[in-house]
């Protein structure tokens, strides 16, 4: 199968990073099912794609990832339009501003988080990626080709004061990514993590945060590394995490990957637990 025949599902596709990922994959010639809960945002993405004369390769799916039923609906609709799903990009995110918009000035304490807020972050950042991956991986393994890219976050954000929901739920996805990569070793299905590498100019960072938007990382930095990670050329790359801001598009992709990459979950700096030998 040529790369142009492949199909990707991208969650959180209506704006910010997700929008750039969708446009980048379409620009590469892939077919994309763009998933988001925001109908207006999806319509704007579709309009931008039509202006680029790539509308035939895009479908939009309005779905709420906190609903268990949404997983089957997304997969069914995407397969109904495009057939086999080859690529999954778990990008959907919920920002700390949904808990409180002045979080940067007055960091949220963990005891201020309601059970409903906690469940929302875990559902979107951890449970939905697991459920979508579980639904799609059997077919990927059957065809001996698949790509899963999980958008987590930087270590500093995982443990930052004021991030008691966003950080832990993204950290769980990071750990899950490492396990996924090990489970899928030798199957032709790769699992990698891609993050911007810092505070990024998206709607998840409210104006109240006080940043100069022009000085923030721009979402478009995610496109070059993603396009390479979902290619045939990256078939031997799995269990890695990449900081898009350190990806140098002027270098050959393999060199850029070496510069911007590290093991998922920072296992190279971890002291692993002592495990005694097993009998038998």
Enumerate the predicted regions with their spans.
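Conserved glycine-rich Rossmann-like NAD(P)H-binding loop of the short-chain dehydrogenase/reductase
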Residues: 28-44
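Alpha-helical segment proximal to the catalytic Tyr-Lys
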Residues: 138, 182-183
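C-terminal helical subdomain
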Residues: 186, 193-194, 211-280
């Amino acid at each position: 199968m040529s790369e142009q025949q492949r199909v990707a599902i991208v969650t959180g596709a209506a704006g910010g990073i997700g929008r750039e990922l969708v446009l980048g994959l379409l620009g590469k010639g892939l077919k994309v099912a763009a998933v988001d809960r925001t109908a207006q945002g999806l319509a704007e993405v579709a309009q931008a794609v039509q202006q680029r004369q790539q509308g035939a390769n895009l479908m939009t799916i309005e779905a709420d990832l906190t609903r268990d039923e949404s997983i089957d609906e997304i997969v069914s609709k995407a397969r109904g339009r495009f057939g086999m799903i080859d690529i999954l990009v778990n990008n959907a995110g919920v920002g700390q501003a949904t808990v409180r918009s002045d979080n940067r000035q007055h960091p949220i304490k963990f005891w201020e988080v309601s059970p409903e807020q906690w469940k929302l972050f875990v559902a979107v950042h951890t449970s939905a990626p697991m459920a979508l991956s579980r639904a799609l991986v059997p077919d990927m393994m059957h065809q001996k080709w698949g790509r899963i890219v999980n958008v987590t976050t930087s270590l500093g954000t995982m443990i930052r004061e004021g991030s008691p929901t966003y950080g832990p739920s993204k950290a769980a996805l990071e750990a899950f990514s490492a396990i996924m990569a090990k489970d899928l070793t030798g199957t032709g299905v790769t699992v990698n993590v891609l993050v911007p590498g810092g505070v990024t100019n998206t709607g998840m960072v409210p104006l109240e945060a006080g940043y100069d938007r022009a000085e923030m990382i721009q979402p478009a930095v995610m496109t070059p590394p993603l396009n390479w990670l979902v290619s045939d050329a990256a078939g031997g790359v799995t269990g890695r995490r990449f900081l898009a801001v350190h990806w140098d598009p002027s270098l050959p992709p393999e060199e850029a990957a070496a510069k911007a990459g590290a093991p998922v979950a920072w296992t190279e700096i971890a002291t692993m637990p002592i495990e005694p030998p097993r009998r038998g």
